[in-house]
């Protein structure tokens, strides 16, 4: 079965979990690894992140969309350029994305974004029990995450869909332009734009910029190798 859940309050279980935080955690994870970071370690708190600071490690993330004091990078994927992060380990803490990972009980967890949409779909074609876990925004529904979930469901072309997957697919089918839909109607996107992050919206809604699939292995996101 394929299903979709939004901002779960309690632990969720499945065999293959796909974590989605379009704006911006999973887009940043995909970008960082695609640009040469050796791994991305998601953590819940700022304090936990700062405790991991050492040579070769970059402390990154945001609270309320802004880079915390003492951090090397924020949560804008545009900051994660090859010359800054190649060969480095990224420790990442964010308001939504890294928090929801803690609630997933799964044999495997991968990170999805519009940036690696086709690669994620290709990887999932061989999987049976799939749960698309949308991070949401501050525990609430997030339009952009649901839209990406619908895009994944649509491309998988499966018949065994849960109610959440059906709804996400229907929503995706009703949208003519995903970028414009997000910019016009996503409250989180509007807030980021008001804070000066409009370029992030443009970047995070770009499809298939990367052909990579980050997977969480022993607490670290690394690039998943598959045929």
UniProtKB/Swiss-Prot annotation:
- Which reaction is recorded as catalysed by this protein? (2R)-O-phospho-3-sulfolactate + H2O = (2R)-3-sulfolactate + phosphate
Cite a single Pfam family from the UniProt record.
Answer: 2-ph_phosp
Q: Name one GO molecular function term.
A: 2-phosphosulfolactate phosphatase activity
What does the UniProt keyword field contain?
Hydrolase, Magnesium
Keyword flag Membrane? no
Q: What class of enzyme is it?
A: hydrolase
Please report any disulfide bonds recorded for this protein chain, giving both cysteine positions.
Answer: none
InterPro entries hit by this protein: ComB-like (IPR005238), ComB-like_sf (IPR036702)
Q: What is its EC number?
A: 3.1.3.71
Q: Which domain of life is it from?
A: Bacteria
Cofactor(s) it depends on? Mg(2+)
NCBIfam families (alphabetical): PRK00886.1-6
Q: Which family does it belong to?
A: Belongs to the ComB family.
Output the PANTHER family linked to this UniProt entry.
2-PHOSPHOSULFOLACTATE PHOSPHATASE-RELATED
- Designated name of the protein: Probable 2-phosphosulfolactate phosphatase
Task: Specify the species.
Answer: Thermotoga maritima (strain ATCC 43589 / DSM 3109 / JCM 10099 / NBRC 100826 / MSB8)
Taxonomic lineage is:
Bacteria, Thermotogati, Thermotogota, Thermotogae, Thermotogales
């Amino acid at each position: 079965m394929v299903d979709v859940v939004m901002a779960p309050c309690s632990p969720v279980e499945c065999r293959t979990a796909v974590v989605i935080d379009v704006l911006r955690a999973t887009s940043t994870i995909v970008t960082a690894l695609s640009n040469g970071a050796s791994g991305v370690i998601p953590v819940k708190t700022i304090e936990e992140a700062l405790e991991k600071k050492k040579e070769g490690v970059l402390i990154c993330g945001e609270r309320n969309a802004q880079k915390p004091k003492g951090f090397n990078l924020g949560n804008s994927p545009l900051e994660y350029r090859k010359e800054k992060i190649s060969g480095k380990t990224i420790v990442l803490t964010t308001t939504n994305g890294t928090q929801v990972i803690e609630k997933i009980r799964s044999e495997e967890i991968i990170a999805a974004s519009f940036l690696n949409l086709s690669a994620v779909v290709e990887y999932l074609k061989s999987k049976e029990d799939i749960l698309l876990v949308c991070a949401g925004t501050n525990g609430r529904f997030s339009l952009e995450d649901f839209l990406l979930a619908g895009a994944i469901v649509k491309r998988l072309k499966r018949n065994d869909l849960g109610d959440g997957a059906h709804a996400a697919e229907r929503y995706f089918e009703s949208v003519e332009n995903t970028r414009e839909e997000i910019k016009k109607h996503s409250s989180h996107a509007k807030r980021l734009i008001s804070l000066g992050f409009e370029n992030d919206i443009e970047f995070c809604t770009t499809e298939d910029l990367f052909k990579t699939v980050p997977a969480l292995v022993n607490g670290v996101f690394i690039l998943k190798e598959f045929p």
